[in-house]
């Protein structure tokens, strides 16, 4: 213990000041040392090549032309998200694209943001995209036209400090177009205006200038957006049609050329039929026979037989290289009604990670509507692919194997379809002879079969009419909103624990997934057909409140393909939206021969758990009530619609007596 003299010396003002200064100096040293040991979040954006305007992650804001150079995506492995083992996602596959996805989800981080106080456009009021003072705006850089969008905070994130702002296109971005994003006058929960980070503030206020940002600010000014109001702004460019489709169109054309058909798209069967075998026939029901067999398809992946996990090997032009003689032998299952005479050939696509056996559920429809219905596995997303899907959820660098095998799967489906209408195909066998009308093929796909079936429809040479049942597009939009996502999130989320990176990853992989699902081909599904491809007409069937395939994604697809809505779609008050089905035009009269969307409803939540509420506004799945996903398509009114649409000269007819279309025993409000 110090004596009284010592205590007096310590308590003197001069000594106290010296001790205080020493303590502060020591504290400063500790802070510096701590900073060296644990970098602040802003350090991520300070790495070489990062965009400093969003310090939450090197690649934010995303998508972003900061990461596009000389007309190509230009990412580095060092910038990419890392899994729990420290392995970065490999950038090479992304760098083969000349732009971002047509459905690319915008991801950025805005600390303290309150979307309601900011009056940002929500998913249930899309018209606010065009409000004069909208705080979140996306414009076409060339025309200045506002884009239809909605904004949300990531409800999947449990850490508020890692909660990303997500902005979705409510009608896809156009191929090859450049867009500018503007965040302005953003508010916190107390209504205070948020201030930008230093890096963007310097650009905005003219302390630092680049040619790119002079152009961005100029285009925003022409669109009526004042520079001084900006919190953050940047640009991004969408991939071209060629970048999105050239691989699939190349393997399609080369595969059919091997059959001797070099003029696909004229709806004329030319050349030979694919090789096939019939391995078994059984009586499935009193009215329908089951026929099992195999067929052979050229394999364009890098392993013999095109197994799960195999990938394209690309040449210098970016096209898949085929190993001479490599083939895939795929199975098929067909349903042949016993009483069929010239039955309509219907190609069917199964649901999530399922298999060809799903076609067996269509036996009643086949018998009643005289459909000869055939299915195969969706290579890339079938039950056989499940181990690969789980494996790539642990290491996203393996994701190209899924997207590449999906494209091989489309060729498989097209070859099965050709067998159904070729005179030397199934019609040459006694199991099918006289029972199949080879004039024209039709397609129906349910759930995943509707998502992948949209892409197939866009490139298919042998059918013109397609029914997509509880479909959508853009897996990056669908995943978090689906009850099916949980089993994959249980693998993905522990592998990528950073909650900001999860949404970034989901958005990023859409660039690869585009080549294997409808999102990458949607602008050509019903109009502006690809070379060697006929024009297609599509019927979309939406189950209101779907727990597995989010209605918002189905409605984005409807806007892109130009589908008109059959009305009345719902009873008054059933939708959560201020203006339901905004910017989806209505069908004026029935019958209707064009692209259409029909909504089926099992009714609101009621006693016994029957019915379902409208989908949640947030990016989470609906778990209350009964899931209508697998119910509505079996409604007699739906089956009759499909049958009348999927025929030569087919149309959408009114099977709902001028009321909303109901299912599962729901007959409408009293």
Residue ranges and their predicted role:
Residues 22-37:
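Bacterial N-terminal signal peptides
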Residues 303-330, 341-432:
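Cap/lid segment of the alpha/beta-hydrolase catalytic domain
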Residues 263-339, 344-345:
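Domain-level recognition of soluble alpha/beta enzyme cores
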Residues 419-480:
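Primarily recognizes the serine-hydrolase "nucleophile elbow" in alpha/beta-hydrolase
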Residues 159-184, 188-189, 325-363:
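A conserved hydrophobic secondary-structure block that centers on an alpha-helix together
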């Amino acid at each position: 213990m110090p004596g009284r003299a010592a205590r007096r010396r310590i308590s003197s003002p001069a000594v106290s000041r010296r001790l205080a200064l020493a303590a502060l100096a020591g504290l400063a040293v500790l802070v510096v040392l701590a900073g060296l040991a644990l970098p602040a979040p802003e350090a991520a954006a300070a790495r070489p090549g990062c965009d400093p305007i969003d310090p939450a992650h090197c690649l934010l804001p995303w998508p972003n032309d900061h990461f596009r150079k000389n007309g190509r995506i230009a990412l580095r492995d060092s910038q990419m998200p890392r899994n729990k083992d420290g392995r970065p996602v490999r950038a090479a596959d992304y760098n083969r694209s000349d732009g971002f996805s047509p459905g690319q989800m915008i991801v950025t981080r805005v600390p303290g943001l309150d979307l309601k106080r900011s009056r940002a456009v929500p998913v249930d009021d899309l018209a606010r995209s065009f409000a004069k003072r909208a705080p979140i705006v996306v414009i076409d850089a060339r025309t200045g036209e506002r884009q239809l969008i909605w904004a949300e905070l990531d409800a999947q994130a449990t850490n508020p400090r890692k909660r990303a702002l997500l902005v979705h296109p409510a009608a896809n971005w156009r191929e090859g177009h450049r867009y500018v994003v503007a965040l302005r006058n953003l508010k916190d929960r107390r209504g205070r205006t948020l201030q930008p980070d230093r890096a963007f503030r310097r650009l905005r206020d003219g302390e630092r200038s680049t040619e790119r940002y002079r152009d961005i600010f100029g285009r925003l000014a022409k669109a009526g957006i004042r520079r001084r109001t900006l919190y953050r702004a940047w640009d991004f460019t969408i991939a071209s049609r060629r970048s999105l489709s050239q691989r699939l169109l190349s393997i399609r054309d080369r595969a059919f050329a091997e059959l001797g058909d070099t003029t696909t798209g004229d709806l004329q069967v030319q050349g030979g039929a694919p090789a096939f075998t019939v391995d078994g026939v059984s009586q499935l029901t009193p009215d329908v026979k089951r026929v099992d067999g195999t067929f052979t398809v050229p394999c364009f992946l890098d392993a013999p037989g095109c197994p799960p996990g195999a990938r394209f090997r690309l040449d210098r032009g970016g096209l898949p290289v085929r190993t001479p003689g490599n083939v895939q032998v795929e199975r098929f299952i067909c349903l042949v009604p016993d009483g069929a005479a010239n039955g309509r050939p219907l190609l069917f696509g199964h649901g999530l990670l399922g298999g060809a056996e799903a076609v067996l559920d269509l036996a009643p429809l086949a018998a009643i509507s005289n459909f000869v219905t055939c299915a195969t596995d969706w290579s890339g997303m079938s039950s056989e692919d499940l181990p690969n899907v789980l494996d790539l959820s642990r290491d996203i660098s393996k994701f190209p194997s899924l997207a590449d095998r999906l494209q091989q799967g489309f060729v498989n489906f097209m070859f099965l379809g050709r067998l159904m209408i070729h005179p030397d195909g199934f019609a040459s066998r006694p199991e099918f002879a006289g029972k199949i009308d080879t004039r024209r093929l039709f397609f129906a796909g349910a759930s995943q079969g509707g998502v992948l079936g949209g892409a197939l429809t866009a490139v298919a040479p042998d059918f013109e009419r397609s029914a997509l049942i509880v479909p959508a597009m853009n897996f990056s939009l669908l995943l978090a909103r689906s009850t099916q996502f949980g089993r994959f999130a249980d693998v993905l989320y522990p592998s990528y624990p950073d909650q900001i990176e999860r949404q970034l990853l989901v958005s990023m992989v859409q660039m690869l997934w585009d080549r294997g699902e409808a999102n990458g081909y949607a602008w050509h599904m019903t109009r502006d057909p690809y070379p060697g491809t006929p024009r297609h007409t599509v019927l979309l069937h939406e189950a209101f409140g779907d727990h597995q395939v989010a209605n918002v994604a189905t409605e984005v697809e409807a806007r892109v393909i130009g589908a008109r809505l059959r009305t009345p779609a719902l009873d008054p008050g059933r939708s959560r939206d201020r203006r339901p089905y905004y910017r989806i035009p209505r069908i004026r009269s029935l019958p209707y021969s064009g692209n259409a969307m029909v909504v089926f409803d099992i009714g609101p939540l009621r006693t016994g758990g029957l019915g379902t509420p409208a989908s949640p506004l947030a990016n989470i799945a609906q778990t209350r009530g009964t899931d209508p996903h697998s119910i509505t398509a079996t409604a007699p009114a739906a089956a009759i619609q499909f049958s009348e649409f999927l025929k030569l000269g087919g149309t959408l007819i009114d099977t709902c007596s001028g009321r909303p279309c109901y299912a599962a025993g729901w007959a409408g409000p009293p």
